[in-house]
Design a protein with these regions (language model features):
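Long, charge-rich low-complexity segments
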Residues: 198-227
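Hydrophobic/aromatic-rich alpha-helical bundle segments in the mid-to-C-terminal region
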Residues: 146-208
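N-terminal intrinsically disordered/low-complexity leader segments
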Residues: 1-16, 203, 210-211
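Amphipathic alpha-helical segments used for helix-helix packing
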Residues: 105-127, 131
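Amphipathic alpha-helical packing segments from all-alpha helical-bundle domains
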Residues: 124-146, 154-161, 165
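Short, amphipathic alpha-helix enriched in basic
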Residues: 8-52, 60-67, 71
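Hydrophobic alpha-helical connector segments
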Residues: 80-115
């Protein structure tokens, strides 16, 4: 089992390490109970946390746990990237490495990710889905050393959101075991993007990418894994 990031700072939020411990423990129960109050209760028990703390830490229940899981995964991805013996210097290679790290680290919890995306794909959670997608691609750009501001700040993230969300769908369907199909898919997508830093999609592309991502999740995964 990969090392988990227990504490991180997400945009505008300092995440409680107790909440992180519950989410990490809950992952073992999601394949059986889905992202649910029951799974959270079991995770809290495994983490040695009193039951009453669950509702305090996750007032909206499972959807709050899903959001925290995504943010912890972002932190783990960034930490793993900076721990590489040699980080890629070219932007497209750094982005490639970050996307693959994000997915490789999630490989052991693939079913939990699938179920999380099923919930995020519901219309009621479209806004949160877009926010989490934005946070992930923003973390990727910043880890790659891109601190641009102004128009390019948004255009680059909109382009990366499209590449990452499409690759995530490919990863969910990849049963190769070694992610070979996912890697090939990502490389094709990156090749199709002539230059991510020169992308010209408007600001609204970030929001549109998130909403399109949510709809794609709902259509692709459907209700097969809804609990």
């Amino acid at each position: 089992m990969s090392k988990r990031i227990e504490l991180m700072t997400a945009p505008h939020n300092t995440i409680d390490p107790t909440a992180a411990a519950i989410v990490n423990a809950t992952l073992l129960h999601v394949p059986f109970d889905g992202w649910s109050d029951a799974a959270l209760a079991l995770g809290a028990a495994d983490a040695g946390v009193e039951p009453h703390m669950v509702s305090a830490l996750f007032p909206r229940g499972a959807i709050d746990a899903i959001a925290l899981h995504s943010r912890l995964a972002d932190a783990e991805m960034v930490a793993a990237f900076h721990a590489l013996p040699e980080t890629p210097q070219k932007i497209h290679l750094a982005i490639r490495a970050l996307i693959l790290l994000r997915l490789e680290l999630a490989q052991q919890n693939k079913d939990a990710v699938r179920r999380a995306l099923t919930m995020l794909a519901l219309p009621a959670h479209a806004k949160l889905s877009a926010e989490l997608l934005y946070e992930t691609v923003d973390a990727m750009w910043r880890a790659a050393g891109q601190t641009d501001t102004g128009f390019s700040f948004y255009t680059r993230r909109a382009t990366l959101a499209a590449v990452y969300s499409a690759t995530l769908l490919a990863w969910l369907a990849d049963n190769s075991g070694d992610m070979a199909k996912t890697v090939a898919f990502l490389d094709r997508r990156l090749a199709n993007v002539a230059s991510i830093p020169k992308a010209t999609a408007p600001l609204r592309g970030v929001k549109a990418a998130g909403e399109q991502f949510a709809r794609a999740m709902l259509k692709t995964i459907g209700r097969r894994h809804t609990r």
